[in-house]
Structure formats: C-alpha cells, structure tokens
C-alpha cells in the first residue's frame, strides 16, 4: 500500500462475545428475550467464547499494522445505552488499551443511530470512529458527532450516501448540504471524509468528483501535533 493508505487488519464485528451473540449468532428478537430471561446462561456462553476473543486480540497485537479494526454497528435502540455500557464498552476499552500499549490505534465501525451513545463513546478509548453517518440518515449532524466523540477521536465518514443519489437528493440540495458540511469543519483536524456506510451502485459518480473539488478548495489539513 505504501503512502497510498493503510492496510488495516480486522478483528470481530461483535466487539465482545455478548455483542457477537446479538450481532451474528442468533436472531435479534430471540437475543432480546434470552437477555431478559436467560441472561446468566448468555454470560456463561460469553465466558466460553472469551479465549477465542483473546486469541484474535493477541494476533492483531502481534502484527505490524499501525491501525487495527475491532467491533461494529452500534445503535442506541439495538445496543441501548445500559447494554452498551455493560456489555460492549469494557471490551472496547480493553482492546483500546492493548492497542495503545502496542503502539497501535484502534478503529471501530460507528455507523447507526447513536445519539444516546455519544456520551459513552469517549470512555471506550477508540481512536477512530469509522463510517460515521450523519443526518439525514441518522438524527445527528456531523458537528454533533464530532462534539460527542471528543477532541481526541478522529471521525471517519461524514457524507451520507443518500446525498450522492439523484433520485433521493436533488442537485441543489446536494450542493447546499456539502457547502454546510465544509463550513462546519473548522480546521478539519481529526476528520477523514468518506461516504457512509458505502457507495451504492446508483450514486451519481459526478457528485463524487464534485466532493473532490470541495476538498481541494478547503485546502490541506495540518495534523494535530504536527
């Protein structure tokens, strides 16, 4: 990859064993029932899964990557604040601490409706919130995400994919959205612009070229501490 970017190794999408049960291992509605009625059994299963998570973390820490990826998809309805605080936050914090001790940065996938999780995110210790998806696809503006993440966390994303789609967002509205986005970037520090969650096939590719024009006009950003 060289100077073109970073190769980032992936850990699990479920940030903790309990999160993996919700995210991958069972139907969501079943998980909610079991979490209320059979929570101790789920916690025992999480303990049995812990060695696998430890092995994944050890493998990531042993590699030469500068940034590692761990955990994804937090939503204040499906990973509601008390659940996030008890079942996800400690695990992310542990991964963040291990990453920092190893001289690495931690990136996690923070798309989703997370307004009521913003005050918990800084306690997780991650360095980059990736795929940040602001309004109109969620209720938070990019400014609110940046304020919630805090001054030491980098926001990766910020351009909701729907503004690139002609059938959803008229050209004039797209231009107004991008003008407002760039007007609120301040110095641009700790922002990596990207399309969230991804670039769907129906986007107007000319609009992606236009985004580059906004970036060029904004000018270079000096990294904090540089």
Go through the PLM ranges and name each one.
Residues 1-226:
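Active-site loop segments of alpha/beta catalytic cores
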């Amino acid at each position: 990859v060289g100077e073109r970017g970073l190769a980032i190794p992936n850990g699990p999408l479920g940030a903790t064993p309990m999160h993996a049960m919700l995210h991958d291992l069972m139907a969501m509605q079943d998980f909610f029932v079991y979490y209320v009625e059979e929570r101790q059994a789920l916690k025992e299963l999480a303990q049995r899964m812990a060695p696998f998570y430890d092995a994944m973390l050890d493998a990531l820490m042993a590699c030469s990557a500068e940034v590692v990826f761990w955990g994804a998809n937090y939503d204040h309805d499906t990973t509601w604040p008390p659940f996030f605080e008890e079942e996800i936050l400690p695990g992310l914090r542990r991964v963040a601490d291990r990453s920092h001790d190893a001289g690495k940065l931690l990136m996690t996938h923070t798309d989703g409706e997370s307004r009521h999780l913003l005050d918990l995110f800084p306690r997780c210790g991650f360095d980059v919130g990736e795929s940040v998806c602001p309004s109109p696809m969620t209720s938070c503006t990019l400014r609110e995400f940046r304020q919630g993440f805090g001054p030491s966390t980098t926001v990766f994303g910020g351009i909701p994919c729907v503004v690139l789609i002609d059938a959803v967002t008229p050209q004039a509205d797209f231009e107004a959205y991008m003008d407002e986005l760039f007007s609120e970037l301040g110095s641009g520090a700790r922002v990596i612009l990207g399309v969230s969650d991804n670039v769907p096939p129906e986007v107007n590719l000319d609009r992606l070229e236009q985004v580059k024009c906004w970036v060029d006009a904004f000018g270079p950003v000096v990294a904090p501490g540089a």
